[in-house]
């Protein structure tokens, strides 16, 4: 019997996000679905074996766990609760792992909003 691996989502393929996502694609053994406002890093991750998505909604409808690597809490809020975001997609997402540098108070408020939609927000800061 073959084991089905949980599909993972990754949104934000910038300077830090793209290499982290590339490692997930290469080493995790999970299918990884990606989205970014810029098509170039999406294409590069696709060339490594990631699945390019045209929108956040497509990521949300395909994955249960989504990693975010975004510039600030502003973009995190937009991706999670804005138009075309994870909440609006009413997809499969149950866990969001935010690796962005975000304001603590706003992150706590966002966690409460997401919890109301059955989504757990995990803050996973990256220190360099």
Explain the meaning of each model-derived region.
Residues 56-68, 73-120:
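Rossmann-fold NAD(P) dinucleotide-binding segment
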Residues 54, 123-124:
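A short linear hydrophobic-aromatic micro-motif
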Residues 126-128:
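Conserved small/polar residues in nucleotide/adenosyl-binding loops
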Residues 1-61, 65-68, 94:
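NAD(P)+-binding Rossmann beta1-loop-alpha1 motif at the extreme N-terminus of oxidoreductases
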């Amino acid at each position: 019997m073959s084991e089905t691996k949980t599909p993972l989502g990754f949104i934000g393929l910038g300077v830090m996000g793209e290499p982290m996502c590339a490692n997930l694609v290469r080493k995790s053994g999970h299918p990884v679905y990606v989205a970014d406002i810029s098509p170039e890093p999406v294409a590069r991750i696709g060339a490594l074996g990631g699945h390019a998505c045209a929108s956040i909604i497509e990521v949300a409808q395909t994955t249960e766990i989504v990693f975010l690597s975004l510039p600030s809490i502003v973009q995190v809020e937009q991706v999670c609760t804005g138009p075309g975001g994870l909440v609006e997609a009413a997809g499969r997402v149950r866990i969001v792992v935010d690796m962005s540098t975000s304001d603590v108070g706003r992150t706590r408020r966002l966690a409460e909003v997401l919890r109301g939609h059955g989504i757990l927000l995990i803050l996973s800061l990256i220190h360099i």
